[in-house]
Amino acid sequence: MSASHEKPRSVEVSSTLSSLESSDLSEDRSDQGRHLTVGGKVVRIVIAFAMMFACALAPPLLKQVPVIQSFALAHENPIGLVESFAVGSCVLLIYGVAVVLALILCYVLGRTLDRGRHVSVGLRTDRRALLWLAGMILAALVVDLVVAGMLHVFGIAGGGQPLPQSPAWLMIVESFSIAFLLQGIPEEIIWRGWLYSSLGETRFAAVSSVLGFTALHILSQGGQQNLLEHLTYLAPPCGFAVTALIVRTISGSTWAAIGVHGGFHVANDLLSDRLHLPVGSITWVLQGLIWAAVGLLILVFHRRQRRLATSSSSE
């Protein structure tokens, strides 16, 4: 299964990055990327890897603090509005540490490694950025619905997995915290925010942003049983990383990429059991291919709109 889809996915990634280079990445800012030495580029990629590990480990380490452990044990089954609010706030604060750490590290890098360079993490919040964020979350829900529909047509949908029995509000808080505070926001700040900008928003920056992020998931544990599944498990992060890069470039906002990344995890968490998505290579490859296709469609539409705008202004 993996071999039959590996080539199309690599072709899609290559063509996407090529299109981006020829249109959206050929701005003046790319000059600072070309002025970087090979060593400077390698250092930045290594730092991105280290930052991602640091942000991922921060919440689990915080949970080991005795006070927090005691609070969690004493409020395993919260009763009443006040206790529920306290538990929900604690969950948000624990996972929010990853976001705070990512922002602090990017600030320090801006004051040291990138001092004097035009590097931006792209977190300016305005109406357009929020629309991109919401739109990509909605796209993530649609992607899972399409994957589920295809699997049902193929007759290979999963069985009826038992749904979580936690209170609905706690499921929503935990899903949001893990999808956005632990993964979507800090990881996109690092890969599509800081690293992409620090490398000059060039083709090399785009490739590094996508492939570096994808490669890290070889260490993830998501139900893989063998080598083939460890490889096909890379399809979703590769696919949505391509789309995250495209929308980051088109919108100029990392919030769009955060919508892709966080939306992917929210959709998986809330819909996988309800849509009977099987855990395995077929689901992962379909998700990766459809996400890459979404990114390519957005890119094609964007380029078409630019051509129409250019032709109308020249008349």
Segment roles from a protein language model:
Residues 1-125, 148, 242, 249, ...:
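N-terminal, membrane-interfacial amphipathic/helix-forming hydrophobic leader that caps
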Residues 46, 50, 130-134, 173, ...:
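Hydrophobic alpha-helical transmembrane segments
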Residues 53-59, 141-146, 210-220, 262-272:
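Aromatic-anchored segments of alpha-helical transmembrane domains
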Residues 62-89, 115-186, 201, 223, ...:
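Juxtamembrane helix-loop-helix connectors linking adjacent transmembrane helices
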Residues 185-208, 249-253:
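Membrane-interface helix/loop boundary segments of multi-pass membrane proteins
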Residues 186-191, 220, 243, 264:
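Short active-site segment of divalent metal-dependent hydrolases/proteases
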Residues 233-246:
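Hydrophobic alpha-helical segments embedded in the membrane of multi-pass proteins
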Residues 251-265:
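Juxtamembrane non-transmembrane "cap" segments at the membrane-aqueous interface
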